[in-house]
């Protein structure tokens, strides 16, 4: 069996797989916890992750929400400046009406 060198692409792929599995595990835990209630044993590690105000990258969730909605984007179709929080809604209506 020949061994291939480790590349950035393979490391990135491994990182993505691990991140997806971690998020899936946390999601399963949350759904089980909400279904079973608080009667089960508590996992300190996962409870810390759930109660944290930071996302998986260590960034504050509230700051991300505010910074994303305060950004303005230019609509390619009609040329208007649209707030980030309303961009998807605008694009749906804008493309339906075919504004120019």
Curated annotation (Swiss-Prot):
The gene is SGF11. Its main location: nucleus. Functions as a component of the transcription regulatory histone acetylation (HAT) complex SAGA. At the promoters, SAGA is required for recruitment of the basal transcription machinery. It influences RNA polymerase II transcriptional activity through different activities such as TBP interaction and promoter selectivity, interaction with transcription activators, and chromatin modification through histone acetylation and deubiquitination. SAGA acetylates nucleosomal histone H3 to some extent (to form H3K9ac, H3K14ac, H3K18ac and H3K23ac). Keywords: Activator, Chromatin regulator, Metal-binding, Nucleus, Transcription, Transcription regulation, Zinc, Zinc-finger. Pfam families: Sgf11. This is SAGA-associated factor 11. It comes from the Eukaryota. One of its GO terms (molecular function) is transcription coactivator activity. The long N-terminal helix forms part of the 'assembly lobe' of the SAGA deubiquitination module. One of its GO terms (cellular component) is DUBm complex. One of its GO terms (biological process) is chromatin organization. Component of the 1.8 MDa SAGA transcription coactivator-HAT complex. SAGA is built of 5 distinct domains with specialized functions. Within the SAGA complex, SUS1, SGF11, SGF73 and UBP8 form an additional subcomplex of SAGA called the DUB module (deubiquitination module). Interacts directly with SGF73, SUS1 and UBP8. It is found in: Nucleus. Gene3D superfamilies: Classic Zinc Finger. Belongs to the SGF11 family.
